Design a protein with these regions (language model features):
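Extended beta-solenoid/beta-helix repeat architectures
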Residues: 1-104
Length: 104
């Protein structure tokens, strides 16, 4: 996994673990697993049957009809159309997710 910068939008067409920065939107195609450890400066669109795992930062929204898991930070919102799981200590739209024994 090399650290790199992509200027503009990016389409993930094959499984990938990314470290670095993408200055535009990211589209995760159907059947693809995209694991982000870096920064995405705009939105993430996850197509149906696509998988997005965020350990880094997304400065926009995560939307689409696929699956998303968040460990890191999403400055925007998570679309209600997505199948999502937000892990403890993740931050979405300024809110840190914390779980207590009563919520599990």
């Amino acid at each position: 996994m090399e650290n790199r910068k992509i200027d503009g939008n990016y389409v993930a067409k094959a499984d990938e673990r990314f470290m670095g920065m993408i200055t535009g939107n990211v589209t995760v195609k159907s059947g693809v697993k995209f694991i982000n450890h870096g920064m995405i400066c705009e939105n993430v669109i996850v197509e149906e049957n696509g998988f997005f795992y965020n350990h880094g930062m997304v400065n926009g929204n995560i939307m689409g009809e696929g699956y998303a898991e968040v460990w890191g930070v999403v400055k925007g919102y998570l679309s209600s159309m997505l199948n999502t799981y937000v892990h403890q200590e993740a931050v979405v739209n300024g809110e840190r997710y914390e779980f207590d024994e009563k919520s599990i």
